[in-house]
Swiss-Prot record:
<dbReference type="InterPro" id="IPR003524">
    <property type="entry name" value="PNAcMuramoyl-5peptid_Trfase"/>
</dbReference>
<feature type="transmembrane region" description="Helical">
    <location>
        <begin position="135"/>
        <end position="155"/>
    </location>
</feature>
<dbReference type="Pfam" id="PF00953">
    <property type="entry name" value="Glycos_transf_4"/>
</dbReference>
<dbReference type="GO" id="GO:0051301">
    <property type="term" value="P:cell division"/>
</dbReference>
<keyword id="KW-1003">Cell membrane</keyword>
<comment type="function">
    <text>Catalyzes the initial step of the lipid cycle reactions in the biosynthesis of the cell wall peptidoglycan: transfers peptidoglycan precursor phospho-MurNAc-pentapeptide from UDP-MurNAc-pentapeptide onto the lipid carrier undecaprenyl phosphate, yielding undecaprenyl-pyrophosphoryl-MurNAc-pentapeptide, known as lipid I.</text>
</comment>
<dbReference type="GO" id="GO:0008360">
    <property type="term" value="P:regulation of cell shape"/>
</dbReference>
<keyword id="KW-0997">Cell inner membrane</keyword>
<feature type="transmembrane region" description="Helical">
    <location>
        <begin position="240"/>
        <end position="260"/>
    </location>
</feature>
<keyword id="KW-0131">Cell cycle</keyword>
<feature type="transmembrane region" description="Helical">
    <location>
        <begin position="72"/>
        <end position="92"/>
    </location>
</feature>
<keyword id="KW-0460">Magnesium</keyword>
<keyword id="KW-1133">Transmembrane helix</keyword>
<feature type="transmembrane region" description="Helical">
    <location>
        <begin position="338"/>
        <end position="358"/>
    </location>
</feature>
<feature type="transmembrane region" description="Helical">
    <location>
        <begin position="169"/>
        <end position="189"/>
    </location>
</feature>
<dbReference type="InterPro" id="IPR000715">
    <property type="entry name" value="Glycosyl_transferase_4"/>
</dbReference>
<dbReference type="GO" id="GO:0046872">
    <property type="term" value="F:metal ion binding"/>
</dbReference>
Length: 361
């Protein structure tokens, strides 16, 4: 909305500042943070009042969780999504279609996660929406978004998988890219969902990935920078940096309340939405493979679950003491702060590795 102040710049030259994506990204970040700081306590109190016993804790998990996390409300993703939405609506260019496509995926996945959390809390069980139903809805949302991105973009780039490290090497998948893109978005959403198991574990790597893709979006959406770095120019995607800024701000606000011992969990409401957002941005800016590097921590968590389930079904034996892998380290005696901070360090290193691909051509 504030973007429209540019129209008054002839009378008020100071309003020219709203032309700059960097300025509006900073504004979105501050707005998202302030919103969560201001309304977070009220949201937490209401969720605690309405949920009663809070998020059900796994009885087969680390026994310490039954004592330290019992009664903690979930659905904290509502705080993040509210701050993200307010920051985006206020500061992003309302005429940019990429903004609305990514925001639609984010809120759509957030709704799926919210309903899943609602089922778990009301029934006090880990069985929310059936896995098949949840995946079906996610694929419908992601597929529609990827179809829009392919239709909106410049052919053949919009329907191609770009290979990093090489100049102009890409695989044109045609409309099959819609299916591939949907897998990227759904995979990212569920990978972040699996990572969200300890206080602060998911939100910081999400913010690191968001900062990385905010930079990538800005560069890919700028013809000069894209040509210099020899990456594919995708007109209009620079505006996605504003969304990433809003997420960073809202994430910082949420971390204030999610720091151990957490006052609230983001739940599926937050983790599915944020993962879906990262996946859809990666598809929009044509850096799907780079997402697997920058979000390597999420990939590791997801792969650990896949390996654990496959191994147990095929051999009757478990590879890890418990999956996802952060619980494996808990069972090995690592403290929660050790796991969380070490995983943060890994996330930073992976983000730097992913960003380095921008120059390696």
């Amino acid at each position: 909305m504030l973007y429209w102040l540019i129209d008054l710049s002839s009378s008020f030259p100071a309003f020219n500042v709203f032309r700059y994506i960097t300025f509006r990204t900073g504004g979105a970040m501050v707005t998202g943070a302030l919103f969560v700081f201001m309304f977070g306590p009220w949201i937490i109190d209401n969720l605690r009042l309405r949920q009663g016993k809070g998020q059900p804790i796994r009885t087969d998990g680390p026994q310490s969780h039954l004592m330290t996390k019992k009664g903690t409300p979930t659905m904290g993703g509502l705080m993040i999504l509210s701050g993200l939405t307010v920051g985006t609506v206020l500061w992003a260019n309302p005429l940019n279609p990429y903004v609305w496509i990514v925001l639609a995926v984010t809120l759509g996945f957030g709704f799926v996660g919210f309903y899943d959390d609602y089922m778990k809390v009301t029934k006090q069980t880990h069985a929310g929406i059936s896995g098949r139903t949840r995946l079906l809805i996610e694929f419908i949302i992601a597929g529609a978004a990827c179809f829009a991105l392919v239709w909106l973009g410049r052919a053949p780039l919009s329907s191609s998988l770009v290979i990093p490290f090489f100049k102009e090497v890409m695989l044109n998948l045609g409309w099959a890219f819609v299916v591939f893109g949907a897998f990227v978005v759904v995979g990212a959403g569920n990978a972040v969902n699996l990572t969200d198991g300890l206080d602060g574990l998911a939100i910081v790597p999400v913010m690191i990935a968001a900062a990385s893709f905010g930079l990538i979006s800005y560069l890919a959406g700028n013809a000069v920078f894209a040509e210099y770095l020899q990456i594919n120019y995708v007109a209009g995607t620079g505006e996605l940096a504003v969304l990433c800024g809003a997420l960073l701000g809202a994430g910082l606000g949420f971390l204030w309340f999610n720091a151990p011992p957490a006052s609230i969990f983001m739940g599926d409401t937050g983790s599915l939405a944020l993962g879906g957002m990262l996946g859809s941005i990666a598809v929009a800016v044509k850096h799907e493979i780079v997402l697997a590097v920058i979000g390597g921590l999420f990939v590791l968590e997801a792969v650990s679950v896949i390996v654990q389930v496959a191994s147990f079904k095929l051999t009757g034996k478990r590879v890890f003491k418990m999956a996802p892998i952060h619980h494996h380290f808990e069972q090995k005696g690592w403290t929660e702060p050790q796991i969380v901070i070490r995983f943060w360090i890994i996330a930073v290193m992976l983000a730097l590795a992913g960003l380095s691909t921008l120059k390696l051509r």
